[in-house]
Amino acid sequence: MTKAVFHPDYPAFLAALKERILHARTTAARAVNRELALLYWDIGRAIVEKQQLLGWGESVIDRLSADLLGAFPHMSGFSPRNMRDMKRFYLAYSDESIWRQPVAKLSKSLSSDLNQNWRQVVAKLDQSPATTDFLRQLLAQIPWGQHLLILNKLTDPTARLYYLRATAQLG
């Protein structure tokens, strides 16, 4: 069997294609994570709103889980536990007043370089009704597993915001 002889540029060409493929995979994974975070926020919001509006109890989560798993048998993420986490995710970050004070408090304790970034965050938060959109965009930058870690380990909104920002900036 003879080995084909390729142009000397072939290794560089192959390396460039591999890099492009890896970049596309990373970009796609980020897009999926972003959409999942937004979906889970929306599901959590919808559950909370229906429970408040119609007086539904916690058992609706078990029913929703069973129905969604039946409708989407090849998809994961709709277990009762995960759906309760979606509700908790929404409740943890939905109250705008929770974010104004911690952001302002945290910005006072940061170095001057970081303080400028936090002032921008505070300014954005003070431009309600854009606050919810701003928070949604911040939350969408972070994979679901990271959100669960933050929710499970931290209860203080200031600490949560710090770790959300750090995760969004540093990955």
Describe the residue ranges of each PLM region.
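Basic, low-complexity intrinsically disordered segments
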Residues: 1-171
